[in-house]
Amino acid sequence: MDEPRETAGAQSLRRALQLLRLLAEHHEEGIKLTEVIAASGLERSTVHRLLSCLAEEQFAERDPDGKAYRLGIDAMQMGFASMRRVPLVDS
């Protein structure tokens, strides 16, 4: 079977989604920039740029002390919206 091809021009989106998944995994305690860099394997400048954009769009937020990131309000609202639509158990 052929491997699925990546959608052309979607590298930044895939990277941002990777970061959102990391933020979700560490939402309660937050995750430091250095930990995001290590876990993602991305360059520091790339991670910083993507997290800054996600924060501007309220999909990520920084702790008041600025040391950790977690999901932002818009990411959580999307999760809540999906919970209302999709049944938790299939019939």
Regions found by a protein language model. Name each.
Residues 2-85, 89-90:
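N-terminal helix-turn-helix
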